[in-house]
Amino acid sequence: ALGPHLLSRAAFDHLCAEQYTCVLWNAIPRDWEGDRNWVQRAIDLCAGQDWTLIVLHDLPTGAMQYLHEFLCRLEDNGFDIEQDFPPECLIVRNGVPDRDAEKYISG
C-alpha cells in the first residue's frame, strides 16, 4: 500500500535536488503471492480504471511464469500498453514535486 512510509524526507529531498522523476503505481495485483490468481486480479484492476499503472514484483515466487498469460489477456481484452504514466502516479517530475507528494513522505 502507498502511504507516508514510502519515502524518507532525505530521499525525497534528494530526488528533488537532483531533478529526478519518481513514478508510483495505482494497481497492486498481489503477484508476490505466487499463484496464477494475480493475472485475473490485474485484469480486473485494469478494467476498473481509465489508466492503470501496475506494479509487478520480480521475486522468486513463481508468479512471473504467468506474465505471458497476463500480457496476452491484456491484448485479448483490448488494453493498450504504453510507456508513459498517469499524471497522478508522478509524485516528482524532473525535480518538481506534485502537490500531493507530501503524503508519501515519512517524518
Name these PLM-found stretches.
Residues 96-107:
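A short C-terminal boundary segment appended to hydrolase-like catalytic domains
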Residues 1-90, 94-98:
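Catalytic domains of cell-wall/extracellular-matrix polysaccharide-remodeling enzymes
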